């Protein structure tokens, strides 16, 4: 089991330069988890695609359903004090620190492409490219 940030989930469901790597990560470990925040962030990505006419509303609904099914049962609330503690030690956003806090709490790696998270939390975060080998 691994913690993934919203970018990794988005790469899996939306065509990008990292889509193949996200698929390889899923093959390596199909049990992904994330803070509940991933849902709102994913909807925000889909909103951008809808507004740029890259995705239809129906397609966005379908992708939301597929992503939710993938993450079902492995979405977690993260305690505010844990998030704020990490915020105080870094320049990462509280959003990013939710993913780090979950990884720390579960004792799992956080797979991400976010350079800021990787550089500020090397004990918890691992680059997607490194994770898939």
Model-derived regions: residue spans:
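Alpha-helix capping/helix-boundary segments
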Residues: 8-9, 38, 99, 116-117
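Acidic, PIN/NYN-like endoribonuclease modules and their adjacent C-terminal/linker elements
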Residues: 1, 92, 100-133
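Entry/capping segment at the start of metal-dependent catalytic domains
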Residues: 42
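Residues that scaffold the ATP/ADP-binding catalytic core of kinase and kinase-like folds
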Residues: 11-12, 45, 120-121
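Acidic catalytic patch
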Residues: 36-39, 59-90, 101
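Short, well-structured N-terminal submotif of metal-dependent ribonuclease cores
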Residues: 1-37, 49-58
